[in-house]
């Protein structure tokens, strides 16, 4: 089953997608059944979410551009740094004994096909990081590795969009990786019963069509199950929480090649679809010609 959060004239709504996976991944227009929840996060927090997701509802047709972040307001977005062996080597870092965690705020999320706007002060070293995102489906606290996958609702894709110059100002990753509306997240949630390839799936990132990252999740140091075990030993993981599992080799920082104005990052994970975000230098301008601080944006 594939579940999406779709923008509407009144906000957002959760939708169960209809159709074959191959046609979904190649189409610009999608069809689905509207569910009685504002978004996929609200659905996951409802209790027996899998049963609720199968209920009948009104049919809906929408464009891929209408897709919102699949879980727009997670309670936690836990990101994992330095988790692909070859990426650690390209960054000249030591292999960690334990997962390296940092937090991304929900404000950083944007839709899987939304444009990204970066003010001039942040444009010096913009970087892409294609990553597998794991979405929790039921409360997990101090769970063992061998049972950890039972707590997964499903999987999606995230671009851990990074402002490297800001990131490198301190020893902490957070500031450079939580910039407002930069992290494409989606395109939808593929439920765990439909996709179980977390430890063996191809991750491919292109920049204006040129391949930059092309690796397999079997290069992960800490598996999805191990990450859930570790994170849940620190605090409860609740429905809708997201673990972003790290990026493979090929990031722009290692090449000294960064995202330029007007360039498009596309990230595809085998079996999960793709996300595609175009970067623009400067603030977005509304149809009225005003900027983001105008009263019409409040």
Name each model-derived stretch.
Residues 8-10, 62, 66, 87, ...:
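Catalytic-pocket segment enriched in acidic/His residues
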Residues 20, 107, 137-141, 161-162, ...:
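Short loop segments at secondary-structure junctions
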Residues 95-112, 128, 261-271:
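Structural signature of FAD isoalloxazine-binding scaffolds in flavoprotein oxidoreductases
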Residues 7, 79-80, 103-104, 127-131, ...:
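Short beta-strand segments
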Residues 94, 101-105, 147-180, 219-223:
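Flexible glycine-rich active-site/ligand-binding loops centered on an Asp-His dyad
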Residues 112-148, 153, 158-161:
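Non-heme Fe(II) oxygenase catalytic core, chiefly the N-lobe of the double-stranded beta-helix
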Residues 1-99, 264-266, 286, 293-297:
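N-terminal non-catalytic cap/leader segment that marks the start of a structured domain
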């Amino acid at each position: 089953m594939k579940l999406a959060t779709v923008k509407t004239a009144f906000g957002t709504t959760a939708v169960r997608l209809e159709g074959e996976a191959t046609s979904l991944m190649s189409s610009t227009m999608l069809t689905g059944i509207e569910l009685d929840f504002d978004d996929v996060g609200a659905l996951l927090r409802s209790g027996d979410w899998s049963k609720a997701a199968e209920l009948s509802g009104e049919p809906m047709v929408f464009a891929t551009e209408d897709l919102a972040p699949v879980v727009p307001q997670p309670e936690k977005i836990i990101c994992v740094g330095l988790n692909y062996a070859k990426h650690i080597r390209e960054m000249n870092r030591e292999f960690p004994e334990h997962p390296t965690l940092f937090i991304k705020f929900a404000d950083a999320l944007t839709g899987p096909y939304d444009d990204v706007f970066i003010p001039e002060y942040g444009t010096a070293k913009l970087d892409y990081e294609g990553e597998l995102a794991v979405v929790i489906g039921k409360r997990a606290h101090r769970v063992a590795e061998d049972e950890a996958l039972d707590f997964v609702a499903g999987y999606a894709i995230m671009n851990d969009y990074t402002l490297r110059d800001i990131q490198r100002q301190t020893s902490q990753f957070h500031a450079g990786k939580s910039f407002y509306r930069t992290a494409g997240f989606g395109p939808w949630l593929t439920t765990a019963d439909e996709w179980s390839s977390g430890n063996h799936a191809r991750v491919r990132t292109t920049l204006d069509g040129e391949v930059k990252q092309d690796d397999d999740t079997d290069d992960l140091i800490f598996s999805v199950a191990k990450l859930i075990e570790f994170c849940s030993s620190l605090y409860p993981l609740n429905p809708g929480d997201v673990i972003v599992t790290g990026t493979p080799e090929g990031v722009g920082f290692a090449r000294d090649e960064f995202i330029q104005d007007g360039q498009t990052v596309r990230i595809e994970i085998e079996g999960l679809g793709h996300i595609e975000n175009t970067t623009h230098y400067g603030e977005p301008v509304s149809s009225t010609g005003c900027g983001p601080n105008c009263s019409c944006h409040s």
